[in-house]
Amino acid sequence: METIHFTKVHGSQNDFFLVDEEENHITEWSDEKRANFAIKLCDRKHSLGGADGILYVTKSSEVGPIGQMRVVNSDGSIASMCGNGLRTVARYLLEKHALTDAKVETMKAILDVKKATSLGFDIPTYQVEISPVKFAAETLPMHVGVEKLFNQVIPELDAELAFSAVSVPNPHLITFVDQAVLDSNKQEKLASYLNSENPYFPDGVNVSFVKRLSDDAIYVRTFERGVGFTNACGTAMSACSLIKKMLDNDILETPLNVYNDGGRVQVTAKKDAAGEISLQLIGNATFVSKGSVRYENDVVTELTNEATDEQGQYQALVKEVKEFLKTTE
C-alpha cells in the first residue's frame, strides 16, 4: 500500500493532479506504473472528480533547472509538453524554492519560468517559455505532401479550410474559422479521425479551430491528442497565437489576448539572433485543493481532500470572459 499526496491544480481549467515524486518517495516508479496510476486517479467518475492528467514533478537530470516535469494524460499516454500544466509546476517549484524565476526541465527542452503580474482578481499568474518551435513536417510528424504547412488547403482534410501545422514541441494543426464552422461538428470529426489510425498524422495531432475577435484577441478551441476537447490547451493557445501573428504580420513581442472555454491567457513571441522563435505563455496557476489517496492493488482510494479559496477568484475571471465572448458571437 502506498499513500500519495497531491495538489489539484489547473491552468485555464485544464486540470491536473500535481504529484511530487521525491516527497512521495516514488522516483523509482516505472513509466507503466505512472501511467496506470494516472488512468485510475484521472477517471472522471472517481470521487475526486478526475483530471486531464498527472504532472509528475521530480529533480532535474541536468544542472541548473530547479525541477523536471513529466506529463501523463488521463489515458496513460505521455505528453511531450503542456503549457497550462507547466504554469502550475512553475508556481509549485518557485514557491518551494522561494524564487521568482528559474528554469524547469521538460521532456524536450529546459524552459524559463517566472512569476508574472496577475491577470486580475488576485489570480496567481505565471509566465512560461514554450519552445522549441518547429515547422518541418518530420517534427510533427506529418505526411500531407508538403515540407511546411502554412495557411494551405489540404483537400484530403477539408475542401475549404486552410491549415497550418507547427510543433511546440507537441504537434498542432490549426485553422481559422467563423462562428458557423465553430458551431458545426467539423472539428470533432476531423480531430477524431486524425487521432485514430490515419496516413497524415501517424502519431496523432492536437487540432485547434481559431476565431478572430479583434486585432489583439482570438478565441481558441482545441481537441487534444490523448484527451479530446478540453477547456484549454496551453501549447495550442501559444501555437495559434504565433500563426495569427504570422498571418497578420503582427509584431511578435506584442501581447495577444487568447480566450478559451477555460478563461483567458496572454501570449508573446520573440525571435533570437539565429532566427529561432520562442513563445511566452502567461496565465493562471490555480491550486484548487490538497489531499492524499491510497494506491493498493491498482485501486486508488481517496483519503483526504481540502479545498483552497483560489477557485472562487478564478471563477470571477471566467464570468468576465463568458460575458465578453457572448458579445462576439
Curated annotation (Swiss-Prot):
Its EC number is 5.1.1.7. Signal peptide: none annotated. The gene is dapF. The active site is at 82 (proton donor), 233 (proton acceptor). GO terms for biological process: lysine biosynthetic process via diaminopimelate. Substrate binds at residues 14, 73, 83-84, 170, 206, 224-225, 234-235. It comes from Listeria monocytogenes serotype 4b (strain CLIP80459). Pathway: Amino-acid biosynthesis; L-lysine biosynthesis via DAP pathway; DL-2,6-diaminopimelate from LL-2,6-diaminopimelate: step 1/1. The keyword Lipid metabolism does not apply. It catalyses: (2S,6S)-2,6-diaminopimelate = meso-2,6-diaminopimelate. Disulfide bonds: none annotated. This is Diaminopimelate epimerase.
